[in-house]
């Protein structure tokens, strides 16, 4: 560690860190942040594991899903469901090095589903993962039948961008010492983890609202008993995964920020005037 002392002529000295310290801090912060982000898949495992089990129960949901599309009024608004399954070309690639090239691979395996607001389309495997369709129709309701849900949906992408930007900012050297007057930039640096978490909140909130509306639609469309209970459990696990993503993202930014701060923040040293 190298420390350089500078003075601002007000009996205040700053122990400033060297360029080598900044580089070391950047590398360690980047590595630590990457390690934390690698835990993300673990949050979705409970959801994926249950969804695989629900494939054999698909018939309990598929009819109600199509009924819900019609009864909800979404079909009249132009919402469609595309049954997304493997074609012959895809099947040749499964189990080979070409498998990652399969378009919508996770959806075709019945492990995911999506709603695209721009074209009002739900994509899922109707032969395996119809249970996910009610949640996706919940996204469609947010998009087309509710102002609050629509606002949340539009805030998702900017929130992702903000969180990613804060991850980068967390790696920038600190110029101001503790106790110095803050400006906007130093405030952002000192609070980047909190701001990153806030950036992820619209996604969590919109997902929760989609699950709530999807569950209500499933119940109104005839899903009941153990099938409804399993649906609620699956949607709860999905929400936990999004909460986990938000928490891990902010934790990653926090750790990177603290490491960078440790290696780069100047230390403010006030020397009493009687020593002059």
Language-model segments: residues:
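Short, compositionally biased, intrinsically disordered N-terminal export/targeting signals
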Residues: 1-12
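Transmembrane alpha-helix/interfacial motif
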Residues: 37-45
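Membrane-interface amphipathic/juxtamembrane segments adjacent to transmembrane helices
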Residues: 47-97, 101, 271
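Cytosolic juxtamembrane segments of membrane proteins
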Residues: 56-64, 212-223
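Active-site scaffold of zinc-dependent metalloenzymes
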Residues: 82-133, 137-144
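Catalytic Zn2+-binding segment of zinc metalloproteases
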Residues: 136-162, 169-173
